[in-house]
Design a protein with these regions (language model features):
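Aromatic/hydrophobic pocket-lining residues that form π-stacking "cages" and hydrophobic walls in ligand
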Residues: 24, 90, 121, 155
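Low-complexity, serine/threonine/proline-enriched polar segments
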Residues: 74-89
Length: 168
């Protein structure tokens, strides 16, 4: 019996992700020994939900703390719902392309720190035993290019023991 190859597709909510899923669906259509894991990493909580102004009054401090907990929970629930919707759309695109649904899985994680995104993707690939990671790369204006790093470029630079596909 041939071992199944596993591909991890790292998705975000931009148009490039849809192109990535369509591309993978097109080139893997009909493959029997292939499994795909669709990954979306929820960004860290926004700073206003991580920082707490506090109070000198203990009761007020507890109240503010509870309110912050509720806001954090609400933000996380909304982010997870958006992630699930994104993953459902990607799953639909892949099944329409001929990928059997039993060969697909989804994974949602929340990042603690923006700088950990690359490591989070590698960790998910290792945990899910994926040999290939697929990411999209959209073009930036020259000015944004100076100040912004491409996730795809960082993955390629840091990759070891895993294949990286970059779809532009």
């Amino acid at each position: 019996m041939t071992k199944k190859e596993k591909i991890l597709i790292a998705l975000d909510d931009d148009l490039t992700s849809k192109a990535v899923v369509k591309y993978v669906g097109r080139i893997t259509s009909g493959e029997k020994n292939l499994a795909i894991c669709l990954l979306h990493i929820i960004p860290p909580l926004p700073p206003q939900l991580r920082e707490f102004r506090g109070s000198e009054d203990a009761k007020m401090e507890q109240q503010l703390d509870r309110e912050l907990d509720v806001k954090c929970a609400r933000w996380t629930i909304n982010a997870e719902r958006a992630a699930q919707a994104l993953l459902r759309k990607a799953t639909t695109l892949l099944t329409k392309a001929g990928m059997p649904s039993h060969s697909l899985e989804t994974c949602v994680r929340q990042s603690v720190n923006h700088e950990d995104l690359i490591d989070d993707i590698f960790a998910a690939a290792k945990e899910k035993k994926c040999q290939t990671i697929v990411v999209g790369r959209s073009s930036f204006s020259w000015l944004k290019e100076v100040f912004h790093r491409h996730v795809a470029d960082e993955l390629v630079r840091k990759a070891s023991g895993v294949t990286i596909w970059v779809v532009e």
